Every structure is written in structure tokens, then in C-alpha cells.
């Protein structure tokens, strides 16, 4: 569990690199920095989070020194910010594939899977009117299967559990930041983001369930459109578009 090395100066995204031992949440820390005027590309990484969180208010926990928990401040125009959730999931996939030679898929909108188990998640907290967002990423790097909480052992993965070998966290961090830096200039091309996402779409063709207006509905996922919405054909034959902010998705068995 060797700690990440401090990185004085600027990182590959052009902003300062903030390395913390322990924090409640890297997203909270980064948000405070953003409100205080921290520049684009500021990276906050912590060895341990005590109150990390994911989408829909879910918690994110990982043993100290086993995962990467980081947040990045980006200052971009509104249209680019809209593409962040899908693009950052693609970036995380590419980084995992580069350092661990794994086959990653994305459960819309931005959970990263290996063999249908979650290895990473992305949480975007955006302020479009102010022109900035915080990109939070949690990646299970070196967590052993037995180190996951019992309730997650059937659904969680790490690069170590997927490959049966250790992955260097420094290399994983370098790959993550490099892929984020590569995608940020391309965000205003919704088609480029959608195309890259479709190549790794874990739900395309799957039966899914979701909740809308308090009612559970089911249907078949048919990929995403160029705006990043999930296209679904309901069991009643209706074509609907689902936006990430208004639904909760879960896979269901066919039949």
C-alpha cells in the first residue's frame, strides 16, 4: 500500500496537483477550491476518503491505499460540460485498458464494468452558469476480492481481481489524467463522445428496469443518441429517451 508520490507543480491538465492523506470527499474539497477560484485542471487526489459518494447519493468506500479517489476541476462552456458524464466514463475505460489490458464496458451513464462488475464510477458536479464542474472518479485498483464489503462482493471488481495481478496506482493515475486531458478538447463534439461510448455500451440490447414518476417500467435498451440519452423501447412498444438525472437503472434478467 505504497502512498502516491507528491507531485509539485502542474499536472497534465495544466493545473496544480493537490495530494491529501485523508479527506471526507475529494469532490467536496475540489468544489471548495473551485468556488475560491482554483484554475482549470486542478487535481485533488486522496489516499483515503471518509465520506466518499457516488451517483444518486450512494456512498463510495475503498480500503486506504487500494483505490484511486480523485477529483478534477474543469472550466468549460456549458455545451462541453453536458458531455462530461459519458466522455469521462470512456476516459476511465481507456485508462484501465491501457494499464491492465482489461476489457471494460460502461453501464449508462458512467459506471465502468469489467465482466458485469463495477470497477469504477464517475460523479460530475457541474455549475454550468458559472462555467465549471468537478469530475470525481473512484477506481478500484488493488483491492482484493475479500476486501470488498460483503454486500458488494458479487457486484464489485478491481483491476487486481480482474487480472489476478497487481496494478501500479501511479501508472493508473498517470493513465487516467492522460485520457482526461485527451478528451477535454473533444467535448463539444457530441457525436465523437457518443461514438466512443457506443463501442463500450454494456446495456445495448439488454432488458432493463427503471423508475419514472414513481412507477417501475421495463423495456429493452437500444443504445444512446448523439445527446447522450439512453434510448429504450418499453414493453408496450413505446420509444422513450432517458436522461441520467431523472432515472435509476438496473439490469433485469430476460424473460
Question: What is each stretch, according to the model?
Answer:
Residues 1-98, 252-255:
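N-terminal lobe of the biotin/lipoate ligase/transferase fold
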Residues 1-3, 78-82, 86-104, 114-255:
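Long, positively charged amphipathic alpha-helical accessory segments at protein N-termini or as interdomain linkers
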Residues 21, 106-108:
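Short loop/edge segments at beta-strand edges and connector loops
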Amino acid at each position: 500500500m505504497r502512498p502516491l508520490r507528491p507531485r509539485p507543480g502542474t499536472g497534465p491538465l495544466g493545473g496544480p496537483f493537490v495530494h491529501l492523506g485523508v479527506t471526507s470527499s475529494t469532490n467536496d474539497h475540489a468544489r471548495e477550491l473551485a468556488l475560491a477560484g482554483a484554475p482549470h485542471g486542478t487535481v485533488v487526489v486522496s489516499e483515503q476518503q471518509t465520506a466518499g459518494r457516488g451517483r444518486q447519493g450512494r456512498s463510495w468506500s475503498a480500503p486506504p491505499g487500494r483505490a484511486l479517489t480523485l477529483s478534477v476541476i474543469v472550466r468549460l462552456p456549458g455545451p462541453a460540460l453536458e458531455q462530461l458524464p459519458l466522455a469521462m466514463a470512456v476516459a476511465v475505460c481507456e485508462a484501465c485498458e491501457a494499464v491492465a489490458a482489461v476489457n471494460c464496458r460502461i453501464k449508462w451513464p458512467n459506471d465502468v464494468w469489467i465482466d458485469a462488475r463495477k470497477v469504477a464510477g464517475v460523479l460530475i458536479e457541474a455549475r454550468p452558469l458559472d462555467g465549471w464542474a468537478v469530475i470525481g472518479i473512484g477506481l478500484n485498483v488493488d483491492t482484493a476480492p475479500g476486501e470488498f464489503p460483503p454486500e458488494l462482493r458479487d457486484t464489485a471488481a478491481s483491476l487486481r481481481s480482474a487480472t489476478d495481478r497487481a496494478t501500479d496506482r501511479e501508472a493508473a493515475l498517470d493513465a487516467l489524467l492522460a485520457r482526461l486531458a485527451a478528451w477535454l478538447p473533444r467535448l463539444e463534439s457530441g457525436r465523437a463522445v457518443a461514438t466512443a461510448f457506443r463501442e463500450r455500451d454494456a446495456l445495448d440490447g439488454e432488458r432493463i428496469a427503471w423508475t419514472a414518476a414513481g412507477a417501475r417500467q421495463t423495456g429493452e435498451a437500444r443504445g444512446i443518441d448523439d445527446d447522450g440519452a439512453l434510448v429504450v423501447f418499453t414493453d408496450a412498444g413505446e420509444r422513450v429517451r432517458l436522461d441520467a438525472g431523472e432515472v435509476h437503472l438496473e439490469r433485469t434478467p430476460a424473460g
